[in-house]
Amino acid sequence: KEIKAFRLNDSNRISPLTQAEKKTYQLPDSLDKISWFRVTKYLSEIFYGGYLLAGPVDIGPLDNLYSFNGIEGSRFRLSGKTNYRLSRRIYADFMLAYGTKDKKMKYDLGLKYSFNSLTKNPYSFPANFIGVQYTYNTFIPGRTIENSNYDRLSLSLTDIVDYRLAFNKSIFLEWLYETKKGITINPYLKFQEVKAYGDWTFSDRDSVEVSSFRKDRIGINIRLLFNGTWIQNQNKRITVGGNFTSMNINYEYGFDNTHLIKANAYRKVNLMPFGYIQLWAEGGYMVGRIMSPYLFTSSTYNSIIYHPNAFNLMKVMEFFTDKYIQLIAVYNLNGLIFNRIPYVRELKLREEFNIKMVYGGLRDENKFLIDNLDVKTFESKPYIEAGFGFRNLFQVLGVEYIRRITYSEGLPELKKWGIRATLGFRF
C-alpha cells in the first residue's frame, strides 16, 4: 500500500524530480543497506524507546524485566506489545510477573482498536482509539495506580524499602481522541477491587478495618498542548523545542459518591543566552469519604537515578492528603558559568538548579484513614527539597546533589541529602 501511494504521488507531480532530488529519496534506503548503520539504528531505538524490537512484537520496557523489593523478593517480568507490523488497527499488550518471595503470578492484558490506520502506534498523532485493559497486579497505595510502575530496576537501587503493596484487580475501558490543535479528550470507566497485601489493612468509612474493597468510577482526562513540537518513535512521544505549555485536567466520579479533581501544568521558558526554566505545577482536591489507597501522595523516585519532576528524598507513602498543591522549578543555565572556566569549558557541561515543594492536608473526616498506616500528613509548613548539579558529561551523564530542607528532624544525616545520577540526552 505504501509503494502504490508513492507511485501515485510521483505520477501526479506537476514537474518531475531532478536527479539530485531523487538521490535525496534514495539516501535513507542506501543507509539501511549498511550493516553498521542498521545495528546502530536498532540499538538507538532500544535505548530511547526502552523496548527490544522483535518483528511484530516489542518486548519491554526493558527496565522492568527484573526488580526486587522486600515483599515480592526478586520480581521477574515479561511484558510487551504488538506493533504496526502485525496490525495497524488492533494493538495488544501483555504483562506476566512473578516474585520469588511471595511466589505469586501477576498479569494484565490489554487491547486497543485504532480508528487511524495510517499510524504506527495507537498514540501517534492524531490519536483516536478505544481500549480495554484487564489487570491483576500489585501497586503502591496512594499513587496513581495507572502510572505507579514501581517495578523498575532503577527504583530497586535504593535503601528506602519500607513501603506497602496492595493487589489491584480491575477492568479499564477508555476512549482517547486527539485533535490536530493539540487537545486530547480521554473519557474512561473503571471497575476495580483492591486487596491489602501483607500484614496490614485499610480503614473504611465507618473506621472499621477491612482487607479489601471495591472502587468503581467514571472519569475524564483533558490535555491541552500549546506551541508544542514533538518527536514520535514507535513507542513514545517526546515533546521538544522552545517555549511551550501543556496542561492536564482530570475529573473522576466514584460510584460511592466521591469526587476527585486534579490538574497539572508544565511550562518551558527559554531565557537565551541564560539557559531555560522548566516549571511543573500541580494540585488536587477530593470530596467525600475516601478510602486510604486513594488519598493523594506525592510522586517519589527513591533511586540512585535522579528524576526531574518527582521527589527524590521523600519516602514512598510519607505524606497522605485529600487536598494538595505542588510546585517544581528547574533552572538550567546551559553552560553560562562552566563555559567561562578554562579547560572546564571543553567538557561542555550544563549547570542546573532545582527546588521542589508540596503542601496539603487532610480534612477531619478523613484523618482516621491513616491511623494504621504509619504515615503522616503535613503540619504548618510544606515539604521542600532543593539541589544543584551538572548535565551533559560525555553528552549523556549528569550528577545532582539534593538536600532535604524541611521535615528532616530526627533523620540521620545521610537521609537528609543525596547524590543522584542522570542518564540520557536532553531536549
Residue ranges, per PLM feature:
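Exposed, low-structure sequence patches enriched in small/polar residues
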Residues: 2-427
